[in-house]
Amino acid sequence: MAWTEKDVENGKESDSLGNNGFLKGVQSSSDSKGSPVRISPVKKSFEGKDAITYANILRSRNKFVDALAIYESVLQKDSGSIESLIGKGICLQMQNMGRLAFESFAEAIKLDPQNACALTHCGILYKDEGRLVEAAESYQKALKADPSYKPAAECLAIVLTDIGTSLKLAGNSQEGIQKYYEAIKIDSHYAPAYYNLGVVYSEMMQYDMALNCYEKAAIERPMYAEAYCNMGVIYKNRGDLESAIACYERCLAVSPNFEIAKNNMAIALTDLGTKVKLEGDINQGVAYYKKALYYNWHYADAMYNLGVAYGEMLKFDMAIVFYELAFHFNPHCAEACNNLGVIYKDRDNLDKAVECYQMALTIKPNFSQSLNNLGVVYTVQGKMDAAASMIEKAIIANPTYAEAYNNLGVLYRDAGNISLAIEAYEQCLKIDPDSRNAGQNRLLAMNYINEGSDDKLYEAHRDWGWRFMRLYQQYNSWDNSKDPERQLVIGYVSPDYFTHSVSYFIEAPLAYHDYANYKVVIYSAVVKADAKTNRFRDKVLKKGGVWRDIYGIDEKKVSSMIREDKVDIMIELTGHTANNKLGMMACRPAPVQVTWIGYPNTTGLPTIDYRITDSMADPPSTKQKHVEELVRLPDSFLCYTPSPEAGPVSPAPALTNGFVTFGSFNNLAKITPKVLQVWARILCAVPHSRLIVKCKPFGCDSVRQRFLSILEQLGLEPQRVDLVPLILLNHDHMQAYSLMDISLDTFPYAGTTTTCESLYMGVPCVTMGGSVHAHNVGVSLLKTVGLRKLVARNEDEYVELAIQLASDVTSLSNLRMSLRELMAKSPLCDGAQFTQNLESTYRSMWRRYCDGDVPSLRRMELLQQQQQTLAELVVPEESPVSPIEKTRISASKDGPIKENGFTVSPALVYNSSTIEENGVQLNQAGNPGKQS
């Protein structure tokens, strides 16, 4: 913010000084009647007093040479004419003959030592030569001679002010202040003295005193633009942006082209825009940013903040325009480059995103957010080594950068190192206990190694849910009619209504719901829609349902939307995976709330009533605990709709290869060391057999080598293993099953989409039951298809089943060619019957609600009772004991971060591809609005 400091100039500050530099106090004579003396064209006719009067008139009209000649003519006849000496001195002074002028004034003073006019003009000459002290002494003599002589007082105030400024600039602020006050004592209406006092007090950070002085300066001189400008600076620095803007408006009203004030106005308006935007009025924020550009059209910060605002409004094309403008006008704005990268990354233009992040790092090599974001892109691309390097650099640049540790955890998770992933998530939570992404990623990661031997994973989910629920206010009443048989409004919320694993299991209900009795409302949080999104939307709307796009909308606002839609049963399909809306579910906007499909465990949220499953994935005898009440469907809890891009089933490759190929397309996190041990036993027992594994991280050589090294240590030669990286096109991915004879499921976290895809492409899958839901998903799928014989009860049986399948290539080939039809005729692909079963389940839930049987309300009441009981047991002198940790977990902020656009470290999260069933949440850091 720019201050204006203007050292006053004598000739410009005193109203008693004429335009020609001489004192107005030296008046030309008039006749006895007070009429002006008429000018005669004939000079020689004037003598004595008349000649002096005529000379004064000429001088007033800037005819100094002619006037000087007359004064000298008079002085030749009367050397003691004081008025002529003064007039002569003024004429010489105006012709830049200062020494001769001074001699003339000195002669006048010699004749009349008390002549205030001559003394004052000597002071002016001293000041012109920079001899301020002598000038002041001369003015003081003039005032002593004539205390009422106003020109001397005004000139003295000017020179004292100049002396004060010189002292201030020399570092003697207190002495400078004293001189300013002396100037005010001499002339209490001298505005520049008040103004310069304001400048000094501002520099001394005595802002109340400074404001008072600026206000007095403005009172004495209402057109004092600099005073209004500096008042605005003080108000702006105090955070009183409205008052600052009012001051700048007054400044510009008197001086419309005052560039400093225009720039300051742009800064204040930009800050006000950021303020109102953070308060929730983003449209007004945009208006202020645009107004800032009216005052300073090349102000990069306003352009940058417009980019942030448009990004938050999901108007990404506009955001790109203003980020590029910001960078154009400020080539050092690394934040603009970073936020451009965030947008391009979310648009899947990864090469452009990398280019933007690298540009940001060229400007700021240790810019932790761009280092982190580059690591995010490399992680998505499967470039694990490069990703690790970038994220580690981000942590070195900013050791307290919590989000970077979260992303390091994602990296370890993708590389299959679950223990290191959990450690990284926990490190993130140590730095930022409120990190929603790290908290949920940690829960997801624990599923990969949980065999159900204890309740630690349940307790982790439960504790997370209790803490998370406290961040939201729960609704406890609804206007929904408690008619058990009326049409129900069913809401589904998910970010995965696109070509994603979950989409293959939600399609059947969308297609087969009885919309007359079950009105469907879809809440789509899809980041980037694709053809499948559009197909789903068209299908729902055509059947009379409702489709609402909620990406980027605050979860509390989504809760309000759900209540306005009068949803009776709300089903979330994501759990703790990417872009979930558990914050919305924590508000409990619907009378009945359900979790289904997207996560293989409890959400931990007390506000969710039910978890939909089946008796194969979660047998009635299960010891696995859930916060929600389990509701079991008659067949599988899943219904698979195959991809139309799958293509035909190919012949068994063993027929032409002469050997059997085992394989898995599950993500690497599921392929634990124990899984590899079992697979190695199978491969070693089947001569010449091969293993094909496909997953994204195999694009990185170090990950490939680590994987092969583990298998080699287990006795399997690397030459027998084919590692395939991510295949982008869904058709190509499905056709890759033509390389595989037998699919090997993972444990204790079984495949879901990969198992269905394998069966649909004719590849039988060997799975193994366990004691937790995640372990038993394959059991549910295979039994539902009619392949109970491929379900093992333990590792030895798993190995035996795989060896047995491989031993009879003919039977294997026959099974392959019949599997698709077997699957299509099974309940797993019977969308109509599945949806009827689902609707019956919903109706039962609703009837229970109408009867007052609400699991979540009972659960929450029990929690409150437990807390109250514990509180009553506390000894008064001791600190209160709470069964719930006080560590708060905050909701992620949507939309990008200037503290460091899209917001403070917004959690822009990564969705898994169709071949990976659980998305993890990456923190992609944007930069929020700048304050100047």
Curated annotation (Swiss-Prot):
Expressing tissues: Expressed in stems, leaves and flowers. Expressed during all stages of corolla maturation.
Gene Ontology biological-process entries: gibberellic acid mediated signaling pathway; protein glycosylation
Pfam families (UniProt xref): Glyco_transf_41, TPR_1, TPR_16, TPR_8
Catalytic region: annotated span: 436-932
Biased composition (Basic and acidic residues): 1-15
Coiled coil stretches, renumbered: none
Pathway: Protein modification; protein glycosylation
Recorded GO CC terms: nucleus
Catalytic reactions of this protein: L-seryl-[protein] + UDP-N-acetyl-alpha-D-glucosamine = 3-O-(N-acetyl-beta-D-glucosaminyl)-L-seryl-[protein] + UDP + H(+); L-threonyl-[protein] + UDP-N-acetyl-alpha-D-glucosamine = 3-O-(N-acetyl-beta-D-glucosaminyl)-L-threonyl-[protein] + UDP + H(+)
Compartments it resides in: Nucleus
A GO term, aspect molecular function: protein O-acetylglucosaminyltransferase activity
Broad EC category: transferase
TPR repeats: 48-81, 82-115, 116-149, 157-190, 191-224, 225-258, 266-299, 300-333, 334-367, 369-401, 402-435
Renumbered residue ranges of the record's region Disordered: 1-39, 881-902
Induction remark: Not up-regulated by GA3 or ABA application.
Classification via SUPFAM superfamilies: TPR-like (SSF48452)
E.C. no: 2.4.1.255
Function comment: Probable O-linked N-acetylglucosamine transferase (OGT) involved in various processes such as gibberellin (GA) signaling pathway. OGTs catalyze the addition of nucleotide-activated sugars directly onto the polypeptide through O-glycosidic linkage with the hydroxyl of serine or threonine. Probably acts by adding O-linked sugars to yet unknown proteins.
Family: Belongs to the glycosyltransferase 41 family. O-GlcNAc transferase subfamily.
Free-text comment about domains: The TPR repeats mediate protein-protein interactions. Expression of such repeats in plants generate a dominant-negative mutant.
PANTHER family to which the protein is assigned, alphabetical: PROTEIN O-GLCNAC TRANSFERASE, UDP-N-ACETYLGLUCOSAMINE--PEPTIDE N-ACETYLGLUCOSAMINYLTRANSFERASE SPINDLY-RELATED
Protein known as: Probable UDP-N-acetylglucosamine--peptide N-acetylglucosaminyltransferase SPINDLY
Organism listed in the record: Petunia hybrida
Native organism taxonomy: Eukaryota, Viridiplantae, Streptophyta, Embryophyta, Tracheophyta
Gene: SPY
